[in-house]
Structures are given as structure tokens and as C-alpha cells.
């Protein structure tokens, strides 16, 4: 698969040959769904917690005697049956992460790249460099028509470009090792540098 390469100012900069094994697959929603679910579950904090009857701030004294009152049998006010009592079998802190094989995660990334290529939402630029000025980069992005974009560079992201992009909320920047299915699908446009293409092909071959 051949794709035109452009510069940040919109000028042509030749073309690049993309590996069909990475960018030419028929995207499968089930694979993408499983990988995104794995990512989001792993990222979930899992700090949810409610108080049980032994943790609520109440006396543990029996509220009245067992027999002879005509009322139902009760123990302490902290019982779940009472208002402001403890919660029975409520959520406790835990990890929501689950396993997903490495081969499947790698396959998911290939399908995410292929999905962007098939939808016409893949752009290749020669390099992502900047003098560190947000206004300049924002103007270039506007002229290129990128509404919500993810830029994936090579092993290292240019410091000036990262600084300029930091204040643009519609632009994310990642090194090649940070490329993941969720971030690729979240943004409308996937922008790869030539170094990023080479690094991804080396990582996923």
C-alpha cells in the first residue's frame, strides 16, 4: 500500500510504502472491542468502597431485648436493614484487570492501524518537529484540517514538537512504543511520521 507523505506546512514530501500486514487487514470490531476493553479495565482505579456493618459509626449494642416487646428481633443499629446501617456485600477495592495474550494485543494494534487506513483517516508526515511555539503548530494543524488527531513518532518525540503540542487539547503525541488501540480509535485522524511507520513495522512484524 502506497501513501503520499506531506510536511506540516502541507507541501508534498514523496510517498511511503506501507506493509499490508499492518495497514491492509480487514478490520474486525470484535478484536478491537476486546483489546479496548482490556485496556480500559486495566486502567480502572478500582478504589470503590462502601462500609459494612462493622465499619459504620454506630454502637454495636442490641437496641432492645430479644423477647417480650412485640417487635421484630433486632441486634445493633448498624445492621443493613436500618437506615444508615452498613451495606451488605457492597463493592470493595479490587483490580478490574484481566489477561489478554500478547499476540492478541499485537493483532488488535494491527487492526486499529488498518481501520484508520481503510477509513481514509491515516496521514503520513515526513517528521514531527517544531520550534516549540503552540500558535505556529495550531495554525498548521488548522490548515491541514485535523480536528482531533493523534501523532505517533519514532522512538523519541521531538522536544520542541511535544512542547508546542502540550497546550493543544485536540492533539495527542506518542512515541512508537506508546501506540495503543484505544488512543488510535479515540482520535479522528491518525498521523504517523516516517520514523513512526518504520518503528511500528519493526515492533509488529
UniProtKB/Swiss-Prot annotation:
One of its GO terms (molecular function) is rRNA binding. One of its GO terms (biological process) is translation. The keyword Membrane does not apply. The keyword Nucleotidyltransferase does not apply. Coiled coil: none annotated. Keywords: Ribonucleoprotein, Ribosomal protein, RNA-binding, rRNA-binding. InterPro entries: Ribosomal_uL4, Ribosomal_uL4-like, Ribosomal_uL4_dom_sf. GO terms for cellular component: ribonucleoprotein complex; ribosome. Belongs to the universal ribosomal protein uL4 family. PANTHER family: 50S RIBOSOMAL PROTEIN L4, LARGE RIBOSOMAL SUBUNIT PROTEIN UL4M. Part of the 50S ribosomal subunit. HAMAP family: Ribosomal_uL4_B. One of the primary rRNA binding proteins, this protein initially binds near the 5'-end of the 23S rRNA. It is important during the early stages of 50S assembly. It makes multiple contacts with different domains of the 23S rRNA in the assembled 50S subunit and ribosome. Forms part of the polypeptide exit tunnel. This is Large ribosomal subunit protein uL4. It comes from Dinoroseobacter shibae (strain DSM 16493 / NCIMB 14021 / DFL 12).
Amino acid at each position: 500500500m502506497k501513501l503520499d507523505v506531506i510536511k506540516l506546512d502541507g507541501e508534498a514530501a514523496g510517498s511511503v510504502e506501507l506493509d499490508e500486514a499492518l495497514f491492509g487487514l480487514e478490520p474486525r470490531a470484535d478484536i478491537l472491542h476486546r483489546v479496548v476493553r482490556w485496556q480500559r479495565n486495566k486502567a480502572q482505579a478500582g478504589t470503590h468502597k462502601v462500609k459494612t456493618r462493622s465499619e459504620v459509626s454506630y454502637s454495636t449494642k442490641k437496641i432492645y431485648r430479644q423477647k417480650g416487646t412485640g417487635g421484630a428481633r433486632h441486634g445493633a443499629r448498624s445492621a443493613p436493614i436500618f437506615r444508615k446501617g452498613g451495606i451488605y456485600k457492597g463493592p470493595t477495592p479490587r483490580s478490574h484487570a484481566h489477561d489478554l495474550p500478547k499476540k492478541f494485543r499485537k493483532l488488535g494494534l494491527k487492526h486499529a492501524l488498518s481501520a484508520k487506513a481503510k477509513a481514509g483517516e491515516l496521514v503520513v508526515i515526513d517528521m514531527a518537529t517544531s520550534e516549540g511555539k503552540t500558535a505556529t503548530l495550531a495554525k498548521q494543524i488548522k490548515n491541514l484540517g485535523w480536528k482531533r488527531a493523534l501523532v505517533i513518532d519514532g522512538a523519541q518525540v521531538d522536544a520542541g514538537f511535544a512542547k508546542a503540542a502540550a497546550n493543544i487539547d485536540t492533539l495527542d503525541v506518542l512515541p512508537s512504543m506508546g501506540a495503543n488501540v484505544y488512543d488510535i480509535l479515540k482520535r479522528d485522524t491518525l498521523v504517523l511520521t516516517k520514523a513512526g511507520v518504520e518503528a511500528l513495522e519493526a515492533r509488529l512484524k
